[in-house]
Amino acid sequence: MEIDVIIPLYKPGKELFTLLDKLGSQSVPVHQVILLNTEEKYFEQLIYGIRFLETYQNVKVYHVSKREFDHGGTRRMGVKKSSADVFVMMTQDAMPKDDRLIEKLVEPLQGEVAVAYARQLPREDSTPVESYTREFNYPAKSRIKSAADLDSLGIKTFFCSNVCAMYDRRTYEELGGFVESTLFNEDMIYAGHLVQAG
């Protein structure tokens, strides 16, 4: 099974190298990392003087203008650049806690689950409100959600986060993927379609 990681970028900093290193040392290997970079000049400044493509041989970089960027459309473009069986959507500030991120995300997709998102842990410098929000939205215990949860969870039934989420490609294609044009919540819109489809 091939697994690709797709990451939209905007003015990436040096933490991108740490993220790529962590993705390169996962217990379940990543086939390809697809970077969808907005505004080429910032990326070029970041990698100036280093052998980026030699160091990160499984990384492909595609540049998108700021005018063209759209949360749904840009991610759709990234999926089209991938041929993997499953793919992970991440943001540039998401950082794997350990080398088992991909392993843990792919486990539920072995059954009937079509998308799994990672738990976000609060940063050490988080405010109490930020910490509480992370704990509420990303509890320690995993849960499979379906239409049966609508009465108890309401709109939270559709919660999914492309900060770090793995998708089954076959189901993604069957449902038509992410909406073409959206400023935000492409992940929850997709999850809503998924829950409604059963």
Regions found by a protein language model. Name each.
Residues 12-25:
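Short, well-formed alpha-helical segments that are part of the catalytic scaffolds
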Residues 22-63:
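Acidic donor-binding segment of Leloir-type glycosyltransferases
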Residues 65-82:
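Glycine-rich, basic loop-to-helix element that forms the pyrophosphate-binding segment
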Residues 83-84, 161-175:
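Conserved nucleotide-sugar donor-binding
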Residues 87:
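Short aromatic/hydrophobic "clamp" motif used to bind/position activated sugar donors
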Residues 99-131:
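Conserved donor NDP-sugar-binding/catalytic core segment of glycosyltransferases
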Residues 148-167, 183:
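A recurrent flexible, glycine/aromatic-enriched loop bordering the glycosyltransferase active site
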Residues 184-190:
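Acidic donor-binding loop at a coil-to-helix junction in glycosyltransferase catalytic cores
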